[in-house]
């Protein structure tokens, strides 16, 4: 009997782990966009007018629960919670619920950035939150939950990042570290997440996961409710979990401790793709991209060119400020068959603390668009760049196909096919790419979705004629606006 019970427990644990890697996408959709700091009402409209029609699979939204109000309203105040009331600068609970419903109705899932590791950092005196709740972080007093000093371990500072105790028990940049082994703390975190599940979300991005013991997170995840079938999820569907674990390869707390609980953010993907497209590595080395580079298995890796944190850091990571290289890197990211893909949608920043676009009363303003649909009032909206949303469509068109017919020039001109459904060529050299290449596509004329769009049977950009043998003439000039070309079966003229 004991052996049967043990086997059943192990079986259930394994099935739960696999379930938490399922993002619950509609149809062939398979790209998440992070609409960083957007208001809920604007996200709802964006789902209906742009994301749904363009085939995006889901949205990662900023933290939804009440946070401290910081002077100047820097973006990071959202990561300093003081209660689990659903009121932030992005909107209130009613607006959040309306957004989730409307996005689900057009096939766009919602994933919430959740803060389970900590509460707000120190604040002089009594802090006021975005829902009007008072707290005294310096005394570890958060009556809006309520949490008190007994719900936190003794305060200490992380001075040694190779010390597991410090990494998981001390305060990350001064933020009050919760005790996730406490029954009370666990119950409040589970209650918060279950409320979001009830409202229709598909899953969670778990902030600062490496600063929590994996066994505590496993308990919390296992205790969550199934997804809400009223929002189109099947019975017994588990929330998709992806966890922020920064692991450069030799960390005391490893990504491998979390990968079976859900997907894990693959930060080395971001760093290495930046290195390659900045010219520090030849693109020919990308043929073995993914696990060949020591990355996590594809189904366990949440992949991205940049995120809201590392786009603000110096180093190899690309961001919107290097648009030509950024678009090439994103095209490769979305074309190569590896990982669970997320693209960034930023606002403009001049320094690390720049707040989102706001009015004189420090209220977040809605994005505005020009005649081409690009954002113009402080929002960058990379997801609305044609070269990026076109590659979201490419990724949908080639889903479940393998990479084939890799070609390179021995340096930084590359091409490859996705089965017989798609083809990507990239030129990151300082001279033209002019070559007959195997596109693997059926014979015909194809619109390059990077330089233009297929509208009413006509291509507004470059086109390529594919011969009966699958070959076509590919030209990407060194002075072309974009350094890549993408063809797929849904863009056949």
UniProtKB/Swiss-Prot annotation:
The keyword Disulfide bond applies. The active site is at residues 207, 244. GO terms for cellular component: extracellular region. It catalyses: Endohydrolysis of (1->4)-alpha-D-glucosidic linkages in polysaccharides containing three or more (1->4)-alpha-linked D-glucose units. Its cofactor is Ca(2+); chloride. Ca(2+) binds at residues 117, 168, 177, 211. Keywords: Calcium, Carbohydrate metabolism, Chloride, Disulfide bond, Glycosidase, Hydrolase, Metal-binding, Pyrrolidone carboxylic acid, Secreted, Signal. Disulfide bonds join 47-103, 156-170, 375-381, 417-440, 447-459. Gene3D superfamilies: Glycosidases, Golgi alpha-mannosidase II. Belongs to the glycosyl hydrolase 13 family. This is Alpha-amylase-related protein. It comes from Drosophila elegans.
